[in-house]
Amino acid sequence: MASKREASPSLRMRKIVLVICEGETEVGYINLLKMWYRSPIRIVSHIEGTKITPALVEKRTKELQISHLDKVNTFLMYDMDVRTINEKLQKCKAQMLLSNPCFEIWLLLHCKDQKAAINSDSLIKELKKSANVWKNYSKAAFKETQKAFLNNNTDVAVKRAKRLCEFQNPSTGIYKLIEMLKNLEGKRKE
C-alpha cells in the first residue's frame, strides 16, 4: 500500500488573487481584505490605473505564476465614471469588480441601500451623512472606526450589492471578490 504523503510545497497548486486597482482607496480596501481573510491577495500598483490594457493584465497575471500549477484569479477593481477606461476594461481577460459611479458606492452599501442613480460628488456627500464613522471620510486612508464598521457590515453590503443591476448606476461588483474570499477561507478551514 502506497504511503499518503502530502505534496511538497513546490508541487501544490497555489491560489492567488490578483486585484488590479485604479486608485489608493481601492488598494487600502484590498489591504483590509488581506488582513481580514488572510488570503493570498497581490495588488498591482494603482499607478497602472489609466494605463490598463489587455497586455498589461496578461503580463501581471503571468508574473504571479511561479509554476504551471498556480491558479491566478485576476480581478479589475475600477470606477465606471470614466468612459474611456470602461472601454479598455471590457477588452481585458479578468473578472470585473466595477463600481458605478465610483468605489464609494460599496462603502455606502455598508450603511444603507442606494437604488437611485447618483453622481460621484453626491455619493461622497451621501456617504458622509449616512453614518457617523463616515463624517470625516477621506479617500487617502481608512480610520480604525471605519475599518471596524466595514468589517462588521460586509454581509449586509454584499446582499445590497447583489440586488443592484450590474454596470447600472448605482452598482458594484466588489461583492464577487468578498464571496470568493469567503469561499476560499471556508475551504481552508475544512
Indicate where each model-derived feature is located:
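C-terminal accessory helical subdomains adjacent to catalytic cores in phosphodiester-
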Residues: 2-16, 27, 31-48, 61-75, ...
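Conserved SAM-binding loop
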Residues: 19
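Helix N-cap/beta->alpha junction signal
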Residues: 22-23
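Structural motif
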Residues: 52-60
